[in-house]
């Protein structure tokens, strides 16, 4: 069976997924571009395309609000199944409209969605047009199901898929011992009795500013580590303002190191103001960590049983 996927960039978790799917079918993946802006290039360096054919419409960085008409060629090209993953990027948007005009059936796979009840009428109608015309949907959560139905999908056409960056071998069968945890803390030069970590880009949407504000009076025997890049002046100023010597900013880490950070920690906090999924929740839970996140994180809403394996808090 010939399957053609359309997606934005070669995110490592997508490459892993496509390599597995390519074992089951004749898979071709059309990427809009090679990279996204403001993402460390090391993120892509372990990508290995093995079991599928890759096509890049553009070299370099993706331009979400420009149309690359090269995509239309691959909408018309013969295959058994068309699958789209983005309805909000202009290039895939025009491809979805083109598929509709050609009366081609297609599957819409989305990672998540948050309903915008206050959006203007034109934007809402465009979303409904783009979402409602799929012949089938792949959704990772109940919240995403609600999103799809709100924008015109028929509930009986929605199918569940597991959205993750993990292989089964990555998941701990049991939590590591205190001895192993302490060895990791020694390896990473961590002197604290308890450790809280968070992972993500230093951008307002990730909510690190209000997390720092919330933890400014935390006991100094608790170490707080935010991992994911170079902090902007705003976050450095907050650290100085609150005299938080126990707050540390850690640069980009590869997968092996990230897994070690999860294992050595006592708590994972993800204070996002909006994430249509949030794969770090899957990752933290796979290493036995309790998680605190907000009601604007779809993976948290799907995976956390409040008070059992973590807590959902109301976004600021």
Q: How would you name each of these model-derived features?
A:
Residues 90, 104-122, 133-136, 140, ...:
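A short, histidine- and acid-enriched strand-loop-helix "catalytic/donor-clamping" loop
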Residues 273:
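Aromatic "clamp/platform" in nucleotide-sugar-dependent glycosyltransferases that forms part
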Residues 252-253, 260-265:
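Short alpha-helical donor nucleotide-sugar binding micro-motif in glycosyltransferases
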Residues 132-182, 190:
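Donor nucleotide-sugar binding/catalytic pocket of nucleotide-sugar-dependent glycosyltransferases
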Residues 4, 189-206, 212-215:
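Conserved donor-binding/catalytic core segment of Leloir-type glycosyltransferases
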Residues 290-294:
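Short hydrophobic beta-strand element within catalytic cores of glycosyltransferases
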Residues 236-253:
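Nucleotide-activated donor-binding/catalytic signature segment of Leloir-type glycosyltransferases, i.e.
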């Amino acid at each position: 069976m010939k399957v053609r996927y359309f997606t934005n960039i070669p995110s490592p978790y997508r490459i892993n997924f496509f390599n597995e799917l390519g074992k089951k079918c004749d898979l071709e993946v059309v990427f809009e571009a090679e990279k996204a802006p403001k993402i460390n290039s090391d993120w892509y360096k372990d990508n290995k395309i093995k079991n599928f054919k890759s096509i890049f419409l553009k070299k370099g960085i993706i331009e979400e609000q420009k149309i690359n008409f090269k995509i239309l060629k691959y909408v018309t090209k013969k295959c058994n199944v068309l699958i789209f993953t983005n309805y909000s990027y202009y290039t895939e948007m025009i491809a979805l409209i083109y598929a509709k005009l050609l009366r081609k059936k297609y599957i819409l796979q989305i990672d998540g969605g948050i309903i915008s009840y206050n959006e203007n009428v034109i934007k809402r109608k465009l979303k409904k047009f783009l979402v409602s015309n799929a012949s089938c949907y792949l959704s990772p959560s109940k919240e995403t199901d609600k999103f799809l139905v709100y924008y015109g999908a028929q509930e009986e056409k929605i199918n569940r898929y597991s959205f993750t960056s993990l292989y089964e071998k990555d998941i701990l069968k049991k939590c590591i011992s205190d001895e192993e945890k302490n060895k990791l803390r020694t390896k990473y030069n961590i002197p604290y009795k308890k450790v809280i970590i968070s992972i993500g880009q230093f951008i307002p949407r990730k909510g690190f500013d209000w997390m720092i504000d919330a933890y400014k009076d935390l006991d100094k025997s608790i170490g707080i580590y935010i991992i994911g890049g170079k902090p902007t002046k705003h976050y450095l100023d907050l650290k100085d303002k609150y005299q938080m010597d126990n707050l540390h900013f850690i640069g980009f880490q590869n997968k092996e190191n990230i897994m070690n950070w999860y294992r050595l920690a006592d708590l994972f906090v993800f204070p996002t103001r909006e994430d249509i999924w949030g794969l770090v929740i899957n990752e933290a839970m796979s290493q036995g960590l309790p998680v605190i996140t907000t009601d604007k994180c779809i993976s948290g809403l799907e995976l956390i049983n409040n008070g059992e394996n973590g807590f959902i808090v109301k976004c600021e």
